[in-house]
Curated annotation (Swiss-Prot):
Gene from which the chain derives: hip
Subcellular location: Periplasm
Bilayer-spanning residue ranges: none
The name this protein goes by in its record: High-potential iron-sulfur protein
Entry binding sites for [4Fe-4S] cluster: C43, C46, C61, C75
Primary location: periplasm
Subunit structure, as described in the record: Homodimer.
Protein task: Specific class of high-redox-potential 4Fe-4S ferredoxins. Functions in anaerobic electron transport in most purple and in some other photosynthetic bacteria and in at least one genus (Paracoccus) of halophilic, denitrifying bacteria.
Family annotation (InterPro entries): High_potential_FeS_prot, HIPIP_sf
GO cellular component, one term: periplasmic space
PROSITE patterns given in the database record: HIPIP
Molecular function, one GO term: 4 iron, 4 sulfur cluster binding
Family: Belongs to the high-potential iron-sulfur protein (HiPIP) family.
Cross-referenced Pfam families: HIPIP
Protein backbone atom coordinates (compact mmCIF):
# COMPACT_ATOMS: atom_id res chain seq x y z
CA UNK A 1 0.00 0.00 0.00
CA UNK A 2 1.29 3.44 -0.94
CA UNK A 3 1.47 5.80 2.07
CA UNK A 4 -0.47 9.08 1.91
CA UNK A 5 2.78 11.07 2.18
CA UNK A 6 4.61 9.15 -0.57
CA UNK A 7 6.32 11.25 -3.22
CA UNK A 8 4.27 11.23 -6.40
CA UNK A 9 5.94 11.27 -9.78
CA UNK A 10 4.03 14.49 -10.56
CA UNK A 11 5.55 16.28 -7.55
CA UNK A 12 7.55 19.28 -8.90
CA UNK A 13 10.75 18.17 -7.13
CA UNK A 14 10.25 14.60 -8.35
CA UNK A 15 9.85 15.87 -11.92
CA UNK A 16 12.99 18.01 -11.64
CA UNK A 17 14.98 15.06 -10.23
CA UNK A 18 13.42 12.50 -12.59
CA UNK A 19 12.24 10.42 -9.59
CA UNK A 20 10.41 7.17 -10.25
CA UNK A 21 9.29 4.83 -7.48
CA UNK A 22 10.38 1.93 -9.70
CA UNK A 23 14.00 2.39 -10.81
CA UNK A 24 13.42 0.19 -13.85
CA UNK A 25 11.00 2.83 -15.19
CA UNK A 26 13.52 5.64 -14.70
CA UNK A 27 16.14 7.17 -16.95
CA UNK A 28 18.97 5.84 -14.78
CA UNK A 29 20.92 4.30 -17.67
CA UNK A 30 21.02 7.58 -19.61
CA UNK A 31 21.61 9.62 -16.45
CA UNK A 32 23.70 7.10 -14.51
CA UNK A 33 25.70 8.44 -11.62
CA UNK A 34 29.17 7.19 -10.62
CA UNK A 35 29.50 4.57 -7.89
CA UNK A 36 27.61 1.54 -9.18
CA UNK A 37 26.37 0.27 -12.55
CA UNK A 38 23.00 1.88 -13.44
CA UNK A 39 21.05 -1.33 -12.84
CA UNK A 40 22.28 -1.39 -9.21
CA UNK A 41 21.39 2.24 -8.46
CA UNK A 42 18.23 2.64 -6.36
CA UNK A 43 17.05 4.63 -3.36
CA UNK A 44 17.92 1.87 -0.89
CA UNK A 45 21.67 2.36 -1.46
CA UNK A 46 21.59 6.16 -1.85
CA UNK A 47 23.12 8.49 0.73
CA UNK A 48 19.99 10.69 0.74
CA UNK A 49 17.71 7.85 1.94
CA UNK A 50 16.77 8.23 5.62
CA UNK A 51 16.49 4.69 7.06
CA UNK A 52 15.00 5.86 10.38
CA UNK A 53 11.95 7.43 8.71
CA UNK A 54 9.05 5.41 7.32
CA UNK A 55 8.66 1.64 7.29
CA UNK A 56 8.93 -1.36 5.02
CA UNK A 57 9.77 -0.31 1.45
CA UNK A 58 8.86 3.37 2.08
CA UNK A 59 11.54 5.57 3.69
CA UNK A 60 12.40 9.21 4.13
CA UNK A 61 14.69 11.11 1.78
CA UNK A 62 16.57 14.31 2.58
CA UNK A 63 15.64 15.62 -0.89
CA UNK A 64 11.90 15.26 -0.16
CA UNK A 65 11.38 16.56 3.42
CA UNK A 66 8.28 15.16 5.11
CA UNK A 67 7.62 12.68 2.30
CA UNK A 68 8.48 9.04 1.67
CA UNK A 69 10.24 7.44 -1.29
CA UNK A 70 10.19 3.81 -2.38
CA UNK A 71 13.41 1.89 -1.71
CA UNK A 72 13.20 0.51 -5.26
CA UNK A 73 13.07 4.03 -6.71
CA UNK A 74 15.71 6.21 -8.33
CA UNK A 75 16.32 9.89 -9.07
CA UNK A 76 18.98 11.89 -10.87
CA UNK A 77 20.58 12.90 -7.54
CA UNK A 78 21.36 9.28 -6.62
CA UNK A 79 24.68 9.11 -4.76
CA UNK A 80 26.20 5.91 -3.40
CA UNK A 81 25.80 5.60 0.37
CA UNK A 82 29.17 5.56 2.13
CA UNK A 83 30.17 2.38 3.87
Amino acid sequence: EVPANAVTESDPTAVALKYHRNAEASERVAAARPGLPPEEQHCENCQFMLPDQGADEWRGCSLFPGKLINLDGWCASWTLRAG
